[in-house]
UniProtKB/Swiss-Prot annotation:
<protein>
    <recommendedName>
        <fullName>Neutrophil-stimulating factor 1</fullName>
    </recommendedName>
</protein>
<feature type="signal peptide">
    <location>
        <begin position="1"/>
        <end position="21"/>
    </location>
</feature>
<comment type="function">
    <text>(Microbial infection) Enhances early replication of Zika virus in the host.</text>
</comment>
<dbReference type="GO" id="GO:0005576">
    <property type="term" value="C:extracellular region"/>
</dbReference>
<keyword id="KW-0732">Signal</keyword>
<keyword id="KW-0964">Secreted</keyword>
<feature type="region of interest" description="Involved in interaction with human CD47">
    <location>
        <begin position="126"/>
        <end position="316"/>
    </location>
</feature>
<keyword id="KW-0325">Glycoprotein</keyword>
<comment type="function">
    <text>Activates host neutrophils; induces expression of IL1B and CXCL2 at the bite site. Promotes activation of human CD4(+) T-cells. Inhibits phagocytosis activity of host macrophages via the interaction with CD47 receptor on their surface. Suppresses expression of pro-inflammatory cytokines, such as IFN-gamma/IFNG, IL2, TNF-alpha/TNF, IL12B, IL8/CXCL8, IL6, in host white blood cells. Reduces host polymorphonuclear neutrophil chemotaxis induced by N-formylmethionine-leucylphenylalanine (fMLF). Reduces CD11b/ITGAM expression in fMLF-induced host polymorphonuclear neutrophils.</text>
</comment>
<comment type="subunit">
    <text>Interacts with human CD4. Interacts with human CD47; the interaction results in inhibition of phagocytosis activity of host macrophages.</text>
</comment>
<feature type="glycosylation site" description="N-linked (GlcNAc...) asparagine">
    <location>
        <position position="169"/>
    </location>
</feature>
Amino acid sequence: METSLPITVVFLIVLITGAQTKPTQGSCTLTDEDISDIKSAVQKASKAAVNDIVLDPTLIDKCPMLEKITASLKSVATEIVQMRDSAISTDQVDQLKQNFEDQVNQIVKSRDIFEKQSGTQATKEHGEMLERMTALQVKVTELEQQIAKQTASMYEDMAELIFQRLQMNSTESVRSYTKHMMEEKLEELMNKLETNYRIYLGALRFLNHMNDQELIGKVFDGILKRLGDMKADSDDVKENGRNLLVNLLCWTVNNDFLGKKYKERQVDLYRMALKFYPKTYEKAANEADVRSRQFCEENFPANLITWFAVSWNDRG
């Protein structure tokens, strides 16, 4: 039997989602009959059927936070549908869907949220309903984050498998298309790859398999230019730049041609390291940051960036 939730649960949503819970937006005047309708809608969500996750607009008028809860459930259901359409392994998606269904059913069984309370007047009180719906929002948000982690991991596994299959079964048409994308649409391609740096590095390593040195050189130079054009005046740009730089260095490992390119462009790499890691005196922190970003086992990226920093300090 679950213990009753303390009133401070109202503030948990701020910690978990970053949402701004304001008293003026906390109106929630639901009845037990309304709660029953909400429970039914949540149960339908367990089947990951996006079109079934619908609430009567009057319920949202009574309790505006239900809009966020419904949106979260739809978001997860949509993600599962997309995974089902694009996945290589249906077993993985079935497992994800089953996990989602189990978790939603656990939420539905939560007595603190959905059990009918004694006394009709008490159920209409603003404070109690706000607490119950906030508890529901917390649980749904936790579920959304859990599913997001699982799907991110699955997408990474799928991407790695795709690159492995391309290397084993690369045809002339695959090579030709890859070359076209890298030469003609590098910026557009990088924009897509930069949403996941493990996939980004996988794509670069696929170029090694093609063994087209001219193309590899163009891509290397193109990424360096991209780094150079970035205005590192916001946290998002700095984060992206660091991830690109670190995994660009990962790409150069165990590649003789890129080893030569690295030597040719060493001054530019030096400048990029200082651009995205300007606090050169924080060697240990910089090294830890680099290692947290790299998708290769080698020490080269961390050693190189911290060596650049030491070299810069020695100049002073």
